[in-house]
Amino acid sequence: MAKEKFDRSLPHVNVGTIGHVDHGKTTLTAALTRVCSEVFGSAVVEFDKIDSAPEEKARGITINTAHVEYNSNIRHYAHVDCPGHADYVKNMITGAAQMDGAILVCSAADGPMPQTREHILLSRQVGVPYIVVFLNKADLVDDAELLELVEMEVRDLLSTYDFPGDDTPIIIGSARMALEGKDDNEMGTTAVKKLVETLDAYIPEPVRAIDQPFLMPIEDVFSISGRGTVVTGRIERGIVRVQDPLEIVGLRDTTTTTCTGVEMFRKLLDEGRAGENCGVLLRGTKRDDVERGQVLVKPGSVKPHTKFTAEVYVLSKEEGGRHTPFFKGYRPQFYFRTTDVTGNCELPEGVEMVMPGDNIQMTVTLIKTIAMEDGLRFAIREGGRTVGAGVVAKIIE
């Protein structure tokens, strides 16, 4: 079968299902592909195929994730679904599957459960900006008051973690019904159609990397006689043009400079764009003023910091992580973008030790500044070996 041509005309949005085990995340994922194929002509993906998700490696961590795609009238959605709870934790912390919005699936028959809470907390910690709720298995609940009660509980839970619980859209339905093509009381296909319309309306179109302020992690520094200093790296976001003023942030005091040239594959360009590997020629910057690990940014867009709270996943022994727990006062290296910086870990109140395979919130104090923003990913390393993955939840100073 010929591969379908990827349609670039529709804006692309990344979503995913989250929620407690057996509340119907995978069934809803399959139902979404089915309903969208009938209404909007995208491909159907069967339940079993999603459920036996292939293993992937992200930063050396094994994660099972299923990726499906579907279209609405106005968008192309890429959707991730994970089979196990541990996969969600790893996926969200490593950012292996970035989400512009999440679909929280909660069984109307059971109400919010421990993982419902944990996935909402994780979404808050890793910066998932929007959550839409699908109250599933509503066909099993005869009592309208019970449905209202569950809805209130879910709204309260969202508000607890700083999501707008009162304004969050909640769709009531049955994923299984939709998957079987049924629609009694508009709980099947109609509910899923409504969910897609809600995704369209409630999750704003993400700002593309190229439209964000310029940032390039510096990987290498060269001196070219007669021309000056060139820094190389892959542009993470934005555009850099010749004559743009720039700042060099992190590891030392912030300095300002000007881009006097952009080179790619030994050709001179007027600009470099997000996703491109290039060299940026800097005016008046000496070879020794810059080092790997700093970032080149649009002035004022990113600040250097040393202290932050983070959500961290500690690799298990099987994943090549530590064999033993660590305790408070643990001082590993934190690998941000292109370099390691040593930092001290404070554990939450009442937590004495952290076991391999755990996920935990911690407060980190680095010995040098790093250009950082909420949502920045990092690896935790001991002498070059990755032992954990984390994400900056909140900058303190």
UniProtKB/Swiss-Prot annotation:
A Pfam family reported for this protein in Swiss-Prot or TrEMBL: GTP_EFTU_D2
Location of the region described as G1 in the Swiss-Prot/TrEMBL record: 19-26
Localization in the cell: Cytoplasm
Residues annotated as binding GTP: 19-26, 81-85, 136-139
Principal subcellular localisation of the protein: cytoplasm
Region G4: start-end pairs: 136-139
Keywords linked to the UniProt accession: Cytoplasm, Elongation factor, GTP-binding, Hydrolase, Magnesium, Metal-binding, Nucleotide-binding, Protein biosynthesis
Cellular component terms per the entry's GO annotation: cytosol
Gene Ontology MF terms: GTP binding; GTPase activity; guanosine tetraphosphate binding; translation elongation factor activity
Region called G5, residue ranges: 174-176
Domain of life: Bacteria
InterPro entries, A to Z: EF-Tu_GTP-bd (IPR041709), EF-Tu_GTPase (IPR050055), EFTu-like_2 (IPR004161), EFTU_2 (IPR033720), G_TR_CS (IPR031157), P-loop_NTPase (IPR027417), Small_GTP-bd (IPR005225), T_Tr_GTP-bd_dom (IPR000795)
Binding site for Mg(2+): T26
EC number(s) recorded for this UniProt protein: 3.6.5.3
Positions of the UniProt region annotated as G3: 81-84
Recorded family membership: Belongs to the TRAFAC class translation factor GTPase superfamily. Classic translation factor GTPase family. EF-Tu/EF-1A subfamily.
Function: GTP hydrolase that promotes the GTP-dependent binding of aminoacyl-tRNA to the A-site of ribosomes during protein biosynthesis.
Name by which UniProt lists this protein: Elongation factor Tu-B
